A protein has these predicted regions:
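Conserved core of the sugar-phosphate nucleotidyltransferase
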Residues: 109-197, 233-236
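Glycine-rich phosphate-binding loop signature in dinucleotide/nucleotide-binding domains
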Residues: 2-3, 92-97, 122-124
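SAM-dependent methyltransferases
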Residues: 1-7, 12, 182-184, 201, ...
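N-terminal glycine-rich phosphate-binding loop and ensuing alpha1 helix
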Residues: 1-60
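Short, high-confidence coil segments that cap the C-terminus of an alpha-helix
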Residues: 48, 96, 124-127, 192, ...
Length: 236
């Protein structure tokens, strides 16, 4: 029998770029918090087993109530993302060897992206990230002056879930320094290889008000289609 993977969802961030109000993961999207959409999407994935959510310390009980239907563990997150990932990792059952870390703000990530990351882990990769080609021209700038144009053919935008062997993720967080924005960066700092799989446009991160509008528009299209096919949303 193929072992299930565990998923950590750091969801304690304030999300200041979305404006004042609730923590980002608890912001409303089409009548439900981003976090509910994200966890529902994870629960639609055949390979996903235990899910641990790191919530704002003041909202742990409220988040447990929100997610009652989805069989998740909710723990108090920390001031920084790394603190929340560590707290969630500590609550994951000891027998889980393959771990995904997923942003609650990437709440419309398709099932296929999750399964591609899992397949790469099961095929022997120690660390995996879903990526997309960079569409825009990218320039390096210093003091408001262009230094050079970067070859975008060598660049990729990185999404989540990011997948890891548990021992490697624990080692990376044990040696973590500040200034890195994702878990794969911590692994890279150890000198360990990180492989890529195809991401998806739908797995964008809800960071600004315009992203919320885009997510609402996408849900308005995908939810009726899923209903006509007799099931839940394909990407939630």
């Amino acid at each position: 029998m193929t072992a299930l993977v565990g998923v950590l969802v750091p969801a304690a961030g304030l999300g200041v770029r979305l404006g004042a109000g609730a923590p980002k993961a608890l912001r409303d999207l089409a009548g439900e918090p981003l976090l509910v959409h994200a966890v529902r999407g994870l629960r639609a994935c055949p390979s996903v087993g235990p899910v641990v959510v790191a919530a704002p310390a003041a909202d742990v009980e409220a988040v447990r109530d929100l997610l009652t239907a989805y069989d998740v563990v909710v723990v108090a997150g920390g001031a920084e993302r790394q603190d929340s990932v560590r707290a969630a990792l500590a609550a994951l059952p000891a027998e889980i060897d393959l771990v995904l870390v997923h942003d609650a703000a990437r709440c419309l990530t398709p099932v296929e992206v999750v399964e591609r990351v899992v397949d790469a882990l099961r095929s022997g990769a120690a660390a995996v990230v879903p990526v997309l080609p960079v569409a825009d021209t990218v320039k390096q700038v210093a003091d408001e002056r262009v230094v050079r144009t970067v070859d975008r053919a060598e660049l990729r935008s990185v999404q989540t879930p990011q997948g890891f062997r548990r021992a490697l993720l624990e080692q990376a967080h044990g040696a973590a320094t500040t200034g890195l924005t994702d878990d794969a960066g911590l692994v890279e700092a150890l000198g360990a290889p990180v492989v890529t799989v195809a991401g998806a446009d739908e797995a964008f991160k809800v960071t600004r008000p315009l992203d919320l509008l885009l997510a609402e528009a996408l849900l308005a299209v995908t939810a009726p289609v899923a209903a006509r096919h007799g099931g839940g949303r394909h990407a939630s």
